[in-house]
Amino acid sequence: MTGKERIQLAFAGEKTDRVPWVPFVGCHAGMLVGADAESYLKSADLIEAGVARAVELYRPDGIPVIFDLQIEAEALGCGLAWAKENPPAVMSHPLGNGTTLADLRVPDEESGRIGIALEAARRIRANHPDLAVYGPITGPFTLALHLLGTEIFMKMFDSPGEVHQLLAFCRDVALSMATRFIKAGCDVIALVDPMTSQIGPDQFEQFVTPCVKEIFSAIREQGALSSFFVCGHAQQNIPVMARTGCGNISIDENIPLEYVREECRKHRISFGGNLQLTSVLLLGKPLDAQKNALACLDVAGEEGFILAPGCDLPYDTPPENLQAVAEIVHDPYKRDVVRQIATEAPDEDRLDLVEYGQADKVVVDIITLDSEACAPCQYMVDAVKRVAPEFEGIVIWREHKIKYRESLVFMTSLMVRNVPTICIDGEIVFVSRIPPRDELIAAIQKRINEKFRLRIQSRKASLYLLGEESERMTALRANIEQAMRELGTSDVVIEHLDQEEDIARFGVVPGQTPAVVMARYQVKSLHRVPETVVIKEWLKDI
């Protein structure tokens, strides 16, 4: 049985001799041939060579031509920022910069890099006749967001008719791209629409379903297979996705595989995923990759399932980790060996973040896969960038790309489970949802207010007036009361001590009175029992 036949049977929901395996090699294939991402994604020759090397190393049943959700956007006038280890990121939105929808035309093969992708598809089809060739296209909602920007979320409420018109145009672009990839020899059209994770089922059915139903119907009429790719916290949309007419749903690690299995089987469609991209494939060891692959196989079963990464493979993914997955797929004995391995992988070291967020400034942490490679991550980072100037000098923000181990440790230490996520002073606030500007500002301001209140509470103090009653003591008390009135403070407790033994406790002798001693209180712990070692550090400051 060829890989192509295996994929076709899996799409039909039938049992195969083994589960088919499709590594989503995009710019990672560039690394395999020594090319950076920009050079790779601009060259049909390099794409052809990179895919050939990936096929040789990873022994797949199917392979994507390319994995770049900016191809259509670039052809339609979006400005791109290129990187050496990631696909490009959209940096400007034509419909937000004076261009109208009437000005746009469905791009042809001569537009942007579309011709490069199609030429690569034709060569890959010819070079690998036994494999299922995937042609990824940008989904209409993600393309619409590239063209308009995050303003689309407000327009869905304020001007739904405009959004429908924009999505209809993006549908036509997707139909054109799908047809061109099919004519170039692709067996599977993968409609990749990660930004749908930002909307709920009702909005999905209102805006996305009508468009993608037409796309999947057209793909089916041309004799090709279709897959709906989604990433992020999109579990709520799986049931409506399954009713769009797609032949397969492919997910990442944010969605439980068992949930997708049940939903897809209800609708008699196949499903794929969801090897962990960063913690396992990028940062783990071959044994970690094999354990993860085996766990996916055990959950998914043997019918209608395609083993794949959760999304486009990171550029620097160690080839040995993907080769280890291929061993699990191809060798039943290897699967048995991995099952028998008793040693557990060591837990990731965790940071002690109990005191995190106690500094004067508010810290906004954005946990991402990589804002240069992941569209939802990019738009979440952009949302924070846009509001940060409102809090200059008060708020600091930083992105934590979990493709780096230290960021992964930080993520697990904060108990973050999904990306992208915004945390404010260590508290998870926005999970896989790009907050509107006003909502984000309100969340940051709320934390600023909380810190201000805590600072006031922690700065309470007592003034001890030492000495017998006298004219000077009366004058001293009057001066203190006037100072408090002028400052508008009432948080200072005033206590008068006139006994010699009480005065002596402060190191003051009778001849030095009247004297004033100020004792300031600092809150050191709330809602927890601090450890002895922590208390010792406090005592050292006394």
Task: Indicate residue ranges for each PLM-predicted region.
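Active-site loop segments of alpha/beta catalytic cores
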Residues: M1-A29, D36, G50, D61, ...
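A contiguous, low-structure linker/loop signature
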Residues: D68-R113, R123, D130
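Thiol-based oxidoreductase modules, predominantly thioredoxin-like and allied folds used
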Residues: G393-S407, T489-D502
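Structural micro-motif
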Residues: T412-I424, G507-A519
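Non-catalytic, surface beta->alpha helical segment in thiol-disulfide oxidoreductase systems
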Residues: I424-R453, A519-I542
